Amino acid sequence: EALSYAACTADETDECLQMDEKCQVHDSLFWDRWHKLNYRSVRKTFEYMKTAPVTEVWIDQSLEKAWNTTWIPDSLRSFRPVFQQLYARMPAEWQETEKGKLIESYAFPAPTVEEGDDMADGLLYDAEGESHHLSELQGRYILLDFWSIYCGPCRMSEPEMEEIVHLYGDKLALVGISNDEKISWSKFLKEHKMPGYQWKEPKNGGRSLASRYKAGGIPHFVLISPEGKILKMWTGYRKGILKSKLKKFISEDTIQ
């Protein structure tokens, strides 16, 4: 039954994507509908997992659904106590595995941040393997872009990101944070010139920057002030939205 709900989510998502422009990926109508379907799928899956045998399949399902308890809307965060109970069912030796530790990070995640809060920071690395932190960019506005190679709207935003990098110069640091596998991400960066800094974070589950900034959908953008305060967070892309958002926070007299 849980799997049928998951299939329903996938089928209706495809249907939604084929609808008119009012229900495109970057639109709130799409995400509202997707979240409702996903909620039903997660609820059914977790109910089954309460009594199902703890096997490799059970572990993999835990990881697949875990991120839903972390950064998607408040209704899904209500599942976190249930997920903590599921984690407690895991044998101790499984909790010590790489997957077990990742599941534990989702069961007991780091707190998320909101607009007005100090920025969250963490370990990032570039394509050469060099370590970085967002703090090294303080003193400038920082625009975080959580994205993926396979995300259509993410790729659509690239020309406008090129524009804002040129427009704001050293007043703004654009930081792309990919959720792709390291090999495919590195290969892509070698073949495509991407704007700004292109970094990636180690797999850290519920304690990742993606989790802390609630990047449940992509592209997900976060604008940070030179003082390290979160000014604005939003999900989705449509032409002109980046310039429109930045213009509200960065005065024109700062532009080169």
Predicted features, each with a name:
Residues 217-218, 229-254:
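Non-catalytic, surface beta->alpha helical segment in thiol-disulfide oxidoreductase systems
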Residues 144, 185, 198:
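Hydrophobic, well-ordered secondary-structure elements that form the walls
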Residues 138-139, 146-163:
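Conserved redox-active cysteine motifs that mediate thiol-disulfide chemistry
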Residues 1-132:
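Oxidative protein folding and maturation machinery
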Residues 155-192, 204-211, 244:
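Structural microenvironment flanking redox-active thiols in thiol-disulfide oxidoreductases
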